[in-house]
Structure formats: structure tokens, C-alpha cells
């Protein structure tokens, strides 16, 4: 058993070095660490399916696919809320007047006056009555054309290296599921591996009925558990995020899991995280990354637009 385990570790380490070439410095080491623990799990339980869980906005994509990205002076890219309103695919807002009403009045009032518990689900609900397939096709095309260039190169390299080595990758995001799922073709993952804020679909049309739990904070932990339980022999071996408030809970959950097969330890990676919340800092591998797949760069410290960007630090 020990010889077999050593062979698995050597195999995944060599594979990691090849796949992760060109990524930022931390990528190779993180992948090697995760695959070493995945090898321990497989050695102890050959039927086990190692799984890695990713946040999306700020973790895979630089910025926010829902709200867009600017540098205080220029719009670097418009988010899918903006683009769907422009395209006439939003059921509440349309045209320039609709854009102003949403970005300048309604969403800021919801987010700041009431709270994200109502504001974030509204981002998925305001497409009620729209054809799910039509909206899905539009969002996928936008991702291929615009957003994939803003994917962090290191995140994509790590995700692909893990997938190639047999670790299944899943995305859990507080963006609308239709938005985050648009990255499935760009990332080469099945659409079923994406979990965002969900609404029921009836007769091919989007409804306003939210599917709970909403994947934010502890809700991400609940969604992660549901996904693992639904995957025969699934084991959560890694988690990636960028925000202590929205991702901290599910990262800590993966890092502190007791009794993983083979004595494996879950790896939790905090990407570009700001000041750590109490009780989180000691559990995470903290890294900084900036390089994108398309070589996209910002002139200043960019941030999501104040009205449109829906995620907290």
C-alpha cells in the first residue's frame, strides 16, 4: 500500500508540473498539495471521488460576471445584468432608462437599504417569464466573447490540472446560476457542475421562485454538502475563494473536515483575500494573483461598479 501511494504521489506531481507550466508561482505547489491528499484518499478508498469546490467572482474571473468591472474611470467590462438589459432579455428593465433605474436607483436601494438577502435573489428573479434556453445561449456567447479573457490564468491552470488528474471541479457562486453557468464551455466543465442562485423553471420559462439555500456564506456550506452527498463516494478535498464574508464558511468547512480517508487533509485557498475574519486566517493557504487568460490588465486598483457589483469584500 505504501509503495502504491508513493507511485500515485509521484505521478500526480509530474503531471502537475507539466499542466501548470506558465501559471503564477503558487499554482504548482497548490495543485501538488491537493493531488497528494487526493492520492491518499484513493489509496485508502479506490472508489472515492475527490472533489474541488470553487467560488466564481473574484476567484475564477477577475471582477464580477453579474455586476461588471471598472477602474473608477472606465468600464473594463459590462456584467451580464447590464448586457441582458441591453439585449432586451430582462423582464423588469429595458433600454437606457431601465439601465439607469436599475443601477442608480433600485439595486442600490435594495442592497443598502434592505440587504443582500433580498437584493441578490432579485438578480435571478428579474428574468421571470424569459426563455431559459434563450437566456442561457446568450450568456454563454457573452462569456466566450468577453468574460473568459478575464479568467485568472492561475485559477484556470489549477482547475484544469485537478480535473485532468481525476479531481472533479464544482463551482458554487452567489451570482445567478444562469450567469455563472455560462462559463461551462469556457472552462470545459459540465453545466451540472455549476451552482448559483437558482430559480424554478416551468415549461422552459424562468419563474420568481427561489431554490434555497442561497449559496452565500453558510448557504455555500449547505450547497457543498448537498453536492457531495449526491455524488456517490464523493469527498471534498479542496476549496477556493476570495472573500472571507461570502466564502470563508465553506473554505473552513473543507479545511477542517475530520477523518478523511487515508489521513488526507482538505486544502482551502484564499485568493487575493483582504483582512481575514476572526477564526479564519489559520485555516487557509493565502495567495495573490493578477494574470488573466487574455492578458487583461487594469491601470488602477479595479473594483466592481459600486451599484452593480453585488459581492462584499
Which residues does each predicted region cover?
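C-terminal cap/substrate-recognition subdomain and adjoining C-terminal extension
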Residues: 25-33, 44, 49-51, 133-170, ...
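Low-complexity, intrinsically disordered/propeptide-like segments
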Residues: 9-14, 254
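Non-catalytic pre-domain segments flanking phosphatase-related domains
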Residues: 13, 18-56, 62-64, 68, ...
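Bacterial N-terminal signal peptides that target proteins for export
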Residues: 1-8
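Short, flexible coil/linker elements and helix-boundary hinge sites characteristic
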Residues: 1, 20-23, 39-46, 80-84, ...
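Short amphipathic alpha-helices and their capping/turn segments at secondary-structure boundaries
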Residues: 39-42, 123, 183
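A metal-dependent, Asp-based hydrolase signature
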Residues: 65-66, 72-157
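Solvent-exposed coil/turn segments that connect beta secondary-structure elements
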Residues: 57-59, 65-66, 199, 273-275
Amino acid at each position: 500500500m505504501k509503495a502504491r501511494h508513493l507511485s500515485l504521489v509521484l505521478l500526480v506531481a509530474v503531471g502537475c508540473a507539466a499542466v501548470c507550466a506558465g501559471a503564477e508561482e503558487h499554482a504548482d505547489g497548490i495543485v501538488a498539495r491537493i493531488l497528494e491528499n487526493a492520492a491518499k484518499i484513493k489509496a485508502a478508498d479506490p472508489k472515492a471521488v475527490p472533489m474541488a469546490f470553487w467560488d466564481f467572482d473574484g476567484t475564477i474571473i477577475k471582477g464580477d460576471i453579474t455586476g461588471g468591472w471598472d477602474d473608477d474611470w472606465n468600464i473594463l467590462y459590462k456584467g451580464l445584468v447590464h448586457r441582458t438589459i441591453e439585449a432586451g432579455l430582462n423582464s423588469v428593465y429595458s433600454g437606457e432608462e431601465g439601465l439607469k433605474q436599475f443601477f442608480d436607483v433600485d439595486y442600490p436601494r435594495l442592497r443598502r437599504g434592505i440587504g443582500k438577502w433580498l437584493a441578490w435573489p432579485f438578480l435571478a428573479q428579474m428574468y421571470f417569464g424569459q426563455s431559459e434556453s434563450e437566456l442561457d445561449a446568450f450568456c454563454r456567447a457573452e462569456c466566450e466573447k468577453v468574460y473568459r479573457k478575464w479568467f485568472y490564468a492561475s485559477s484556470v491552470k489549477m482547475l484544469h490540472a485537478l480535473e485532468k488528474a481525476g479531481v472533479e471541479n464544482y463551482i458554487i457562486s452567489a451570482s445567478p446560476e444562469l450567469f455563472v453557468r455560462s462559463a461551462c464551455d469556457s472552462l470545459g466543465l459540465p453545466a451540472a457542475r455549476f451552482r448559483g442562485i437558482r430559480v424554478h423553471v416551468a415549461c422552459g420559462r424562468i419563474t420568481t421562485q427561489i431554490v434555497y439555500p442561497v449559496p452565500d456564506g453558510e448557504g455555500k456550506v449547505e450547497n457543498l454538502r448537498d453536492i457531495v452527498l449526491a455524488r456517490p463516494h464523493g469527498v471534498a478535498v479542496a476549496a477556493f475563494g476570495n472573500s472571507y464574508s461570502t466564502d470563508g464558511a465553506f473554505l473552513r468547512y473543507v479545511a477542517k473536515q475530520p477523518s478523511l480517508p487515508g489521513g488526507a487533509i482538505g486544502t482551502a485557498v484564499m485568493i487575493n483575500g483582504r483582512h481575514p475574519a476572526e477564526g479564519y486566517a489559520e485555516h487557509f493557504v493565502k495567495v495573490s494573483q493578477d494574470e488573466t487568460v487574455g492578458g487583461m490588465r487594469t491601470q488602477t486598483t479595479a473594483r466592481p461598479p459600486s451599484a452593480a457589483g453585488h459581492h462584499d469584500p
